[in-house]
Amino acid sequence: MPASLTPSLDAFAEAKLAGLNAAGLRRRLVPTARTGGARAERGGRPVVSFSCNDYLGLATHPAVVAAARAALERYGAGSGGSRLVTGDHPVFAELEAELARRKGHEAALVFGSGYLANLGITPALAGAGDLILIDELGHSCMWAGTRLSGARTLPFRHNDLKHLEALLARERGEARHALILTERVFSMDGDRAPVADILDLARSFDAWTLVDDAHGLGVVGPDATAPLEMGTLSKALGSYGGYLCASRAVIDLLTSRARSFVYTTGLPPASAAAALAALRLIEAEPERAARPLALARRFTARLGLPEAQSAVVPVLVGEAEAALALSRALEARGFLVVAIRPPTVPAGTARLRIAFSAAHAEAEVDALAQALSELGAAG
């Protein structure tokens, strides 16, 4: 190995890593190969995965794979540039039209990822002199977008309409514009936001609302439509990318002002084609979309947990090391359920985040519930 070029930098990194190790918070990459359905090979051994966000099992669906392959052969491996230069391949317009239609909006804009979408949307719409109110459990990328915006940002207690209303009543008058940020399905808790009620509040205070539907699209039924509906192509759609659905005027503005759209290479056309095929499958096969929630509710009923509201069910453990130990115990029994630790979740709330897929068999769900019961982790 060559000698370090920057000893002080390495010393800094090693000290930080030591602290992460001591707290049980160091992350490591573990090669994991999907082998079909909800099964995978991890560390050389087969497991049933309950940590994958491919909620509908479409990432390996023959029609989705075929659409990606056809686009790959026609357009090549990459888009070749920013979409505003040479990277706007025809499949993007098809995908955006389908997303907008499904969401009941005039237009849509596809980004490089859901994270990039939130990094671009909020700073393009809000800035100094504006007010942002965000659910305290909003995803990291929503918070990152607020910080980039420069707007005054205040969290409201999770799904607490009274607190949100009080903040609007107190703060809205001094702000030029107000933007409310929430998730339709919260990624770490699996519960749902009262979107219709939030929209009613927003209208009464002339505030705009952005709903992050990353974990809801294709899995939970439709509810009220927000003026700004964003999400990802990487979960139920089994592909990669992010999007915003909104009015034509807003989409045109974002096309010019969202820095994470303007200054980055467009998605590979194959990813867009795969997402488009997945959207069409969801519409053609509604029974597929109903399955993850049904399996999640089967699981919560077996363990006496609150009824699942989405395809995500948390099993709270508490401390990070305890969550890691439980995850290892499950993996020894053939189940991959990754421990979620701070800072992804608040300190003291480390958990197993269990994600259900249409690819799971009922017997696999029952076996996981039995394993958790035997380990004394739930119920």
From Swiss-Prot:
Its cofactor is pyridoxal 5'-phosphate. InterPro entries: Aminotrans_II_pyridoxalP_BS, Aminotransferase_I/II_large, AON_synthase_class-II, PyrdxlP-dep_Trfase, PyrdxlP-dep_Trfase_major, PyrdxlP-dep_Trfase_small. Transmembrane segments: none annotated. It holds the Pfam family Aminotran_1_2. Keywords: Acyltransferase, Biotin biosynthesis, Pyridoxal phosphate, Transferase. It is an enzyme of class 2 (transferase). GO terms for molecular function: 8-amino-7-oxononanoate synthase activity; pyridoxal phosphate binding. Homodimer. This is 8-amino-7-oxononanoate synthase. It comes from Methylobacterium nodulans (strain LMG 21967 / CNCM I-2342 / ORS 2060).
